[in-house]
């Protein structure tokens, strides 16, 4: 169970610390004051290994387009250059942090047959780089993956450790949960 939780730069929350969390908690407040954002941050924190959770949160808020602007809705002040950080402690001594960064890069595609290497076009790609750090019994593990939305509201995810571009890419419009979600990608 989570005992302490911090939210940095997520939606309308610049910084929020929740301490001494119990098994039953109430969030009370006016409309549009951030109650749902706290729950969404907890959702990302509790299951960070599912590669399209970030995009699913936007869909729940009816931001159905998977484009650069809709991804920036996750960041405080719509500032994609900031870092979302979700940090928490568990009652079993585990410490966990989830970081989400927005990125844009220029990507080069060659023709499908890869024979006409002089005929290349460059376009911008964008997505979210998610990093999970987990410390259990003094041993830290780090999990990395990137999520790139596609036009059909699906996403592609790949591990940072892959040396070949997109060698192990998984197309994921929906991925069923794994028995142990923290085994998604082990760095």
Could you tell me what each predicted segment is?
Residues 48-187:
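Phosphate-coordinating catalytic segments in nucleotide- and nucleic-acid-processing enzymes
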Residues 1-47, 57-59:
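Pre-Walker A-like glycine/lysine-rich segment at the N-terminus of P-loop NTPase domains
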């Amino acid at each position: 169970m989570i005992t302490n939780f911090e939210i940095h730069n997520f939606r309308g929350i610049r910084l929020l610390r929740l301490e001494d969390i119990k098994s039953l908690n109430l969030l009370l407040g006016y409309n549009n004051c951030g109650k749902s954002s706290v729950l969404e941050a907890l959702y990302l924190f509790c299951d960070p290994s599912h590669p399209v959770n970030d995009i699913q949160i936007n869909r729940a808020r009816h931001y159905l387009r998977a484009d650069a602007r809709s991804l920036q809705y996750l960041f405080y002040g719509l500032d994609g250059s900031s870092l979302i950080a979700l940090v928490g402690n568990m009652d079993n001594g585990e410490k966990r942090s989830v970081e989400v960064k927005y990125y844009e890069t220029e990507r080069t595609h060659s023709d499908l047959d890869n024979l006409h290497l002089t005929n290349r076009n460059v376009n911008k790609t964008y997505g979210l780089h998610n990093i999970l750090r987990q410390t259990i019994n003094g041993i830290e593990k780090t999990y990395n993956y990137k999520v790139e939305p596609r036009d059909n509201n699906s996403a592609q995810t790949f591990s940072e450790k892959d040396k070949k571009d997109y060698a192990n890419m998984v197309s994921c419009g929906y991925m069923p949960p794994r028995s142990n979600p923290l085994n998604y990608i082990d760095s």
